[in-house]
Amino acid sequence: MSPLACRQCGATDGPFTRDGLCENCEDGHPGWVDGLSADDYHADHTTISSSGLRALLPPGCPAQFKHDRDNPQAPKREFDLGHAVHTEVLGEGPEVDVLPFDSYVTKAAKEARDEARYMGVVPLLRHEWEQVQAMADAVRKHPVAGPLFAPGSGIAERSIYWTDPTTRVRCRIRPDWLKPAGEGRLIVVDLKTARAVDPNALQRAVYEHGYHAQAAFYLEGSKALGLHGDQEPAFIFVFQSKTPPYLVHLVELDFPALTLGAARNERALRIYADCERTGNWPGFNDRITYLPLPPYAEKRDQEEYL
């Protein structure tokens, strides 16, 4: 995208603010950008993302969120596989560099890995690349996921911006895949790799990682831009196991889960708006916390020792 373009909606006719926004985006108008790099998307401190909102709530807190936002961490190897699968399935994502090594034991392998990181690409060992190919193939062969991700049938990695009407906080999302499903309905798709994809494991993962809040936020953003046509949009998680045979499990959350997710987002937006307004980003508690044992531990010890 041209440097003389709004970094949110891509408009080139200006004028632009000091933050690189056009007048429409500065005034809170919704918009989207196709082709925005992931680095540019995540570097935006004028908007809040779903992961940012989740980080503001327990077990996180505003102080930790602000520190992490202002001090981005280096890429972690445990995310490399997922990033590479995204690129293979979606046709969009970080570039992958397949290194001619079986491990990172040798100095040459470590230097090649570090060089790839420096160049902003994802380094993979040969066997990791073979795994990525097998995982992508399993997605393509799935009777529902395969057609869902059919090349040319959707939009990958669109960056979407809007303003929350209650708090006036500027929000952003970046759906993995936007898929028109006929008769004007939109399907918002998120592809995730996981250790296990059985229903019990996915229930725990959704709650522990706040995926119900993510789904609600992405649906809200899609509707704010009117991308959903004349029907309510759907949000589908495509979970894939990282172990053979790389099972694929598609999940749509029920109404109570989405309602609770939206409620979490509303509270996090209020917290964020207050922190931005006051400049105060609190931790957990500035006073002494009176801390009991977890209920399960107290019950177990009472039965054992009292």
Predicted regions and their residues:
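Cysteine-rich micro-motifs
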Residues: T17-G28
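Metal-dependent nuclease catalytic cores that hydrolyze phosphodiester bonds in DNA/RNA
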Residues: G28-R172, D286, Y290, E303
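Metal-dependent nuclease catalytic regions and adjoining charged, substrate-binding loops involved
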Residues: Y207-H212, F217-L306
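Conserved catalytic cores of phosphodiester-cleaving nucleases, focusing on short active-site segments
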Residues: I173-R204
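Short cysteine-rich clusters marking metal-coordination/redox-active sites
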Residues: C6-C9, C22
